[in-house]
Swiss-Prot record:
One of its GO terms (cellular component) is cytosol. PANTHER family: 3,4-DIHYDROXY-2-BUTANONE 4-PHOSPHATE SYNTHASE, GTP CYCLOHYDROLASE II-RELATED. The keyword DNA repair does not apply. Residues 1-204 are annotated as: DHBP synthase. This is Riboflavin biosynthesis protein RibBA. D-ribulose 5-phosphate binds at residues 28-29, 33, 141-145, 165. Residues 205-424 are annotated as: GTP cyclohydrolase II. Its EC number is 4.1.99.12, 3.5.4.25. The record marks 127, 165 as: Essential for DHBP synthase activity. One of its GO terms (molecular function) is GTP binding. The gene is ribBA. It comes from Rhodococcus erythropolis (strain PR4 / NBRC 100887). Binds 2 divalent metal cations per subunit. Magnesium or manganese. Keywords: GTP-binding, Hydrolase, Lyase, Magnesium, Manganese, Metal-binding, Multifunctional enzyme, Nucleotide-binding, Riboflavin biosynthesis, Zinc. In the N-terminal section; belongs to the DHBP synthase family.
Length: 424
């Protein structure tokens, strides 16, 4: 497995005017870009980039700067398969020669990053390609364009970068892949990071949720307060059902009983027997109500372990043909579990929780919530609700996904007498 460097090192290098190597997902471009801050552009940096890349040097900018500098899309209808937002090409109007030299392009790059520059400071077309980054950066679009702007911002520089794809030194005509990029980075003392790690870093260190509303919700389990949140960048709405005083007797939000429940329309609403989601939600509400103090956090956007409702229904078709729940996802070209718990962790922190007892049979959920400043003092098992329809699903969760399902062995021993819908 390729060794990646820390995001902290990459940010420090960007701030110091060095280049870094950034790789994206192998299912996307699967390429590595050299990236440095546009305001730090020098003839030497540009010449180095030209030597080891395709030479098609681009300057990612945020949308406000693109508008201020009069940089419309290169083509009215973007047909790029990855949605790269090319704008019209530019050169600096003054102080350069033809615009193509490393010195000239560095001057144009610095001018693009200069907050005092304006549309009239550039000629069009030119030899530098500005790109429009998506608002929200890599959290909205996991591309090199957004990574460059994010890294510059994180380095307390202007939100403008310089990027270009690194070419292979081993296979003429090809782009460098991850293993070769690691060697390249080491040879030139450059940090090598992944966009996936950059996304994870931002989710961990930045606040991405807003508390929108609160309302009293009487249920058959008792009364809860529904606290509504929205995720800033993907606009997904989540609800925390809160029981009692979260601060608790010590006033520090410690030892709170918490269930982080992934949205499941088929199980939670329609009562599908293919999964145990509905019974788990019901049990969690009951356990928190009996505790008198706790939270059931309902995470939207987690349908089908994060693959979405339509893909989940397609996975059901494959399961009916013999695949298990893990292989069905993989056959669709999707991960076995695409859920991210960073937003959930931020909501729990916002509610004032410092430590919790986590209601789950899934050890991975504990790992997913760890590291966000939350202390998990205990994992409380959820009661099993097995039936003939979800038995294969539960076996797969136990055998392939590591879930601790207390009572499943007993149910299996008696399954010959069980009827569809019979619960344990």
């Amino acid at each position: 497995m390729t060794r990646f460097d820390s995001i902290e090192r990459a940010v420090a290098d960007i701030a110091a005017g060095k280049a870094v190597v950034v790789v994206d997902d192998e299912d996307r471009e699967n390429e590595g870009d050299l990236i440095f801050a546009a305001e730090k552009a020098t003839p030497e940096l540009v010449a180095f980039m030209v030597r080891y890349t395709s030479g098609y040097l681009c300057v990612p900018l945020d949308g406000d700067d693109c508008d201020r500098l009069g940089l419309p899309p290169m083509y009215a209808t973007n047909q790029d398969k990855h949605g790269t937002a090319y704008t019209v090409t530019v050169d600096a109007r003054e102080g350069i020669g033809t615009g193509i030299s490393a010195s000239d392009r560095a001057a144009t790059m610095r001018l693009l990053a200069n907050p005092e520059s304006g549309a009239n400071d550039f000629t069009r077309p030119g030899h530098v390609v500005p790109l429009r980054a998506k608002e929200g950066g890599v959290l909205r679009r996991p591309g090199h364009t957004e990574a460059a702007v994010d890294l510059a911002r994180m380095a307390d520089l202007r939100p403008a970068g310089v990027i270009c794809e690194i070419v292979s030194q081993k296979d003429e005509g090809a782009m460098a892949q991850t293993d070769e990029l690691r060697v390249f980075a080491d040879e030139h003392n450059l940090a090598l990071i992944s966009i996936a790690d950059l996304i994870a870093w931002r989710r961990k260190h930045e606040k991405h949720v807003l508390r929108i509303a609160e309302a009293r919700i009487p249920t058959r389990h008792g009364e809860f307060t529904a606290v509504g949140y929205t995720s800033i960048y993907d606009e997904v709405e989540h609800v925390a059902l809160v029981r009692g005083d979260i601060a608790g007797p010590d006033g520090d939000g410690s030892d709170v009983l918490v269930r982080v429940h992934s949205e499941c329309l088929t199980g939670d609403v329609f009562g599908s027997l293919r999964c145990d989601c509905g019974p788990q939600l019901d049990a969690a509400l009951d356990m928190v109500a009996q505790e008198g103090r706790g939270v059931v956090l309902y995470m939207r956007g987690h349908e089908g372990r994060g693959i979405g409702l339509m893909h989940k229904l397609q996975a059901y078709q494959l399961q009916d043909a013999g695949s298990d729940t893990v292989d069905a996802n993989l056959e669709l070209g999707l991960p076995a579990d695409a859920r991210d718990y960073g937003i959930g962790a931020q909501i729990l922190v916002d509610l004032g929780i410092s430590s919790m007892r986590l209601l789950t049979n899934n050890p991975a959920k504990r790992v997913g919530l760890d590291g966000y400043g939350l202390q998990i003092t205990d994992r409380v098992p959820m009661p099993l609700r097995a039936n003939a329809e979800n038995l294969t699903y539960l076996r797969t969760k136990r055998d392939r996904m590591g879930h601790d399902l207390i009572g499943l062995d007993e149910y299996e021993a008696n399954q010959n007498t069980a009827q569809p819908g019979t619960a344990l």
